[in-house]
């Protein structure tokens, strides 16, 4: 990864997300409510709710907020009219972007997403235009200095698909989405804390942006992430370390 640092990008991304914590909580509450509505209030038997619960924990959301969201969903209030919608598009320099939304009004949402792309130098694409460039998977990223042997042993025993160590000493563990909860529990039991862990759309190749292009791309991502109906934004862009 010449020209940029994966870990600088991760810390930069986390910092921006932490700054938007209030909006993040709103998105997680919506996700919890819909997950409970679809699969019940028990996270042990509802994998989707377990994932949302874990997100809430990582975001330091109070347990009372989580429980209220579960009760609303399981009781049939709220969430009834929400549906998941995915949009695909292009950013600066043809960078690939996936936007996952949860909405009760598709017309409103697609208009807002299209406007965010157009206003910030991108454009909304057709279904399937960039999704093939990403893989749906569970991902755990351990910072440089983590024990490679210990991470690898726990990961492979728990069913990981791949363990990759980069030039900086960071470790990436990839698994099938269905295996993500088991791996997370295995790492926690072993006292291993990932810097980042989630079920994501992982870019299969990367596009590096620098200078003005990087600034413009970050504005586009911020605009998309700032939309109320947007749950997640994925891109194949990595930013120069200086950005």
UniProtKB/Swiss-Prot annotation:
Keywords carried by this UniProt record: Cytoplasm, DNA-binding, Transcription, Transcription regulation
Keyword Transcription regulation included in the entry's annotation: yes
Gene Ontology CC terms, in alphabetical order: cytosol
InterPro entries registered for this protein in UniProt: Integrase-like_N, TACO1_YebC-like_2nd/3rd_dom, TACO1_YebC_N, Transcrip_reg_TACO1-like, Transcrip_reg_TACO1-like_dom3, YebC-like
GO molecular function: DNA binding
UniProt GO BP: regulation of DNA-templated transcription
Pfam family, one: TACO1_YebC_N
Domain of life: Bacteria
UniProt xrefs under SUPFAM superfamilies: YebC-like
Keyword Metal-binding applies: no
Cell compartment(s), UniProt: Cytoplasm
Chain residue ranges for the region called Disordered: 1-21
PANTHER family: TRANSCRIPTIONAL REGULATORY PROTEIN YEBC-RELATED (PTHR12532:SF6), TRANSLATIONAL ACTIVATOR OF CYTOCHROME C OXIDASE 1 (PTHR12532)
Family matches, as HAMAP family: Transcrip_reg_TACO1
Protein family membership: Belongs to the TACO1 family.
Protein name: Probable transcriptional regulatory protein BAV2207
